[in-house]
Amino acid sequence: MTNAEIAAALEELGTLYERDGADRYRVRAYRTAARAIRDCPDSVAELAAAGRVKEIPGIGKTLEEKILTLLETGDIPSAVKLRGKLPAATAELDSFLAENPGEGLVELSDIRGDLHSHTTLSDGRNTLEEMAAAAQKRGYAYLAIPDHSASHGFGDNVTAERLWGRIEEIRAWNEDRRGFRLLAGSEVNIGTDGSLDYPEDLLAELDWVIASVHTSFSISEERMTSRIVTAIENPHVDCIGHLTGRLIGRREPYAVDVEAVVAAAAQSGTMLEINGNPNRRDLKEEHARLAADAGIPVVLNTDAHGIETLDNMSYAAIVARGAGLTPDDVANTRSWGDFSRLIKR
């Protein structure tokens, strides 16, 4: 077995763990090991046979055992188990779209851009350039890069100074491109009082602001609702991300008056997203329908933290179709020119 094949197996295992909701450090360990094996100048199979595989940086006892099993059997038991658990869901996406044509409902082919992705500037795994290239391969016309703001509690701390630098970087990138646009953005954490991380002058310079709750989930429904409505009323907030904060099977939605939030969003012209992270799928169908009925443009997003999770758009589409959304209900079925008119700036 070649180094590339071993690396691919560990890379796949990392992705499977990620989609199963594993701790990000565990996922990162497999991806780091995969890179080390891919870059190793010696045959990893020969090193393993000689009992020297742990000489490779990042390879400890657990990974050594998985590599030895892979070399002996051609697969890794934990990967087999996860494939049996997850692709049932992955295959379900394709079969659902095929078996439920739902005349007039939104389809993946209608999507023109993704408005929620992350890069190495915060807690993503790929660079801005890599994410842009992957989005272009999917036929998108635009991609927003709203890396996490300073107080979200994980990943790198994107200070105001670093965000100004990212704005300049994206503006320069767009100058040399035609037919595809990157949006300089931020996924800004909403404080318990509805305040946002960055000063107003910085928020005003961004192309796209998505505001989300990442902290203090246990406050009362009244306070949580006021918190989110205050963010919605900010003239620089274009969209609210993963509205109820749920992580399926791991964390219940926090207490929030969704109807009140929808009413405020409709009043202020703020979009709401269907977050396609398979562990979120938030808005759920009922809430997506409520938003569409209120005239709110719903955004189908991936919350991608790497190029492979740009595929999360399928999960968002499943929810949208289950809610009966048409292309007209979905903001990012529009061309860049038409979509840009929905942005508050």
Where are these regions (language model features)?
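Long, highly charged, low-complexity intrinsically disordered interaction regions
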Residues: 1-106
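Ser/Thr-glycine-rich phosphate-binding loops at phosphate-binding pockets of nucleotides
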Residues: 115-121, 142-146
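Core AdoMet radical
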Residues: 144-145, 186-188
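Short, compositionally biased low-complexity segments
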Residues: 3-6, 138-145
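Positively charged, glycine-rich low-complexity segments
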Residues: 125
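Short strand->helix junction
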Residues: 120-122, 305-306
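Charged catalytic cores and adjacent phosphate/nucleic-acid-binding surfaces used
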Residues: 2, 33, 42, 54, ...
